[in-house]
A protein has these predicted regions:
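Helical "lid/coupling" subdomains associated with nucleotide-phosphate turnover
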Residues: 1-19, 25-70, 85-239
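Conserved catalytic-loop position in the HRD/HxD motif
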Residues: 75
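Acidic, divalent-metal-coordinating active-site segment for phosphoryl/phosphodiester hydrolysis
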Residues: 79-85
């Protein structure tokens, strides 16, 4: 909300920040009143709000998470998922798809395994259709995963009672582990999901959709294992 942005800006200034940067991604890009929202944010926090494009968001996440060399990046957000391929600082390709965890959950809530399997297949078709350019690259990069779905998966895999994204930095997840969590979560009730160590209660409804997106992406891009990163577009923006 506008008030939340104002509070964050005020807190940053109270902590001594000399310059405040504010940028908006998928939710504001898609909102009918996105421009009105950013204008109100600018008025309350006293700094310009930049609405970044989907491709720009993909590049920012890559810059934030890449550690150099040939790198593929998957950033699963609420409204969209970004894919980027690069070598060091050179971007080979970047794309943003309209299939975030919140968006996919709104289209088809995952209440049983059949819902999960259908979501995986839907996401695979979307990737085949909208990320053809990236799928055509023959490079074999190290893959890195960014966003709440990734770090939540890491926290659940390690059974960390109090979720902290930084504790998952550098952790790796393979495809069987991702697919296994997808199957287990899909078969759980909402109450059971809320009891899983590492899964914050407010993510209990959307996390299976995020995992379905990740499984679909790993299968389409031929990813057997990826490294988790707590860094993403905010880090990339500051760089």
């Amino acid at each position: 909300s506008v008030e939340a942005v104002g509070e964050l800006a005020g807190g940053a200034r109270a902590d001594g920040a000399q310059k405040i940067f504010v940028f908006a991604t998928s939710a504001v890009r898609d909102a009918a009143n996105g421009r009105i929202f950013t204008e109100r944010c600018e008025a309350i926090c006293g700094t310009k709000v930049e609405i970044v494009s989907g491709e720009e968001e993909a590049v920012l996440s890559y810059i934030g998470a890449s550690e150099g060399g040939a790198c593929g990046m998957i950033d699963i957000g609420g409204g969209s998922t970004e894919f980027t391929l690069g070598e060091d600082e050179r971007i080979l390709g970047a794309v943003s798809l309209q299939m975030g965890a919140v968006r996919m959950n709104a289209q088809r809530p995952i209440l049983k395994y059949e819902d999960y399997a259908a979501t995986v297949e839907q996401c695979r078709r979307m990737i085949q259709r909208d990320a053809q350019g990236l799928l055509a690259f023959e490079t074999k990069p190290e893959w890195v995963g960014v966003g709440g779905t990734m770090t939540t998966l890491g926290a659940m895999e390690r059974a960390i009672p109090l979720f902290d994204a930084q504790t998952c930095e550098g952790m790796t997840l393979d495809l069987p582990t991702v697919a296994g969590w997808g199957r287990r979560l899909a078969r759980m009730s909402m109450a059971e999901r809320r009891q899983v160590p590492g899964l914050m209660a407010h993510r209990a409804d959307i996390i299976p959709s995020g995992v379905a997106i990740l499984e679909a992406a790993m299968r389409e891009f031929g990813v057997n294992e990826l490294r988790l990163s707590a860094h993403g577009n905010m880090d990339g923006y500051l760089k």
